Amino acid sequence: MVNNCVDENLKKRIRTCLSNLPITINTSYGDPFQPDQWENTLNKIKYLKEQNYQGEVEVSTKWILSNEQIDELYHANPNLWIMCGITGLNEGKGVTLEDRFDNYLRLCKRFKRTVLNTRPLIPNKNDSMDILTPIIEVAAKGNKLLKHGGYLDPSNSKNKKTKYDELRKEIHSLCVKLGVDDGPRCSCIVTDVTGKINSTYEDSEPKNLDVLKALGFDFEIENGFVKLIGFRNSGIITKGDVSFARLIIESSHIFDNWTDSHQYMQMKGPENQTLVCTSSWFHWAREVPCQVGCWYCHVKPGTAIYFVAGDSGCSPIDLYSMLFES
């Protein structure tokens, strides 16, 4: 539905906001670089480039890429963020830890925004420095960027990620010694590298409130914080709505008052597809059966966290076109 009640100056600002959202590609169910997903992932990256998309673009993967694929990917977008998964949990038949180390280092040679992603850390599985030290040492040989995080039980959508405060200190201590940046979130690492605002931690007055309203979000301001009260008079707030609004206002000054814990948004895409937003990324994904086979996966069909089958998301610029262009 086209919104004709927005003036041209505001439209320009809305387009700028949407075209600067951080976006993750094909990180739903199915690895973005597995054979039956490779072309789709590559096409999405190229499409964003053709649109002159200004936001950070990311893929999370545990797939082993050939040098030819790395070259093709580099030509599509040399500034791509690649979260390269190495957990020590032996995912994928016939893939050794050394194979994963080699894959990571080859990616680092071409992509300066390759991050070694050792997530999840699962209690009594890979949550020890005996397992993590060799992984961190390899991160130090690459781009010196490390992401780690807790385990989310796929059988319970209301569970939070496991905490590992003491281990976190040990990881950080070794990272400091080796010169590795182990930002607590993807968004922290992105900010460290690019200098862009990290909405999760930005302690400042909310911006773009007129943009948020024009996009259909109902909200109040309470003690300087945005308090969502619904979307287009729905009276419902999802976790995805809050995450998306936080990215728009470029501030942490928003209440986590969601009434639905799923990451999907109430806004729909140009083809009425589900839209998904997490704390760090807006999602654009095609769902395919995953060929990596992570036994701990929390987004595969049948888990409590899984919400809806099929494709989700779109280019945010296409979202703008749907809402504000005839």
Could you say what each language-model-derived stretch is?
Residues 1-81, 279-287, 294, 298-326:
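Conserved Radical SAM active-site core
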Residues 3-5, 29-37, 89-105, 122-133, ...:
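Conserved non-cysteine loop/helix-boundary elements of the Radical SAM core domain that shape
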Residues 20-27, 55-59, 79-83, 112-116, ...:
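Hydrophobic beta-strand segments of well-ordered beta-sheets in folded domains
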Residues 23-34, 63-67, 80-95, 118-125, ...:
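Conserved radical SAM core fold
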Residues 99-156, 170, 174-187:
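Conserved C-terminal portion of the radical SAM core fold
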Residues 155-326:
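C-terminal accessory extensions appended to soluble enzyme cores
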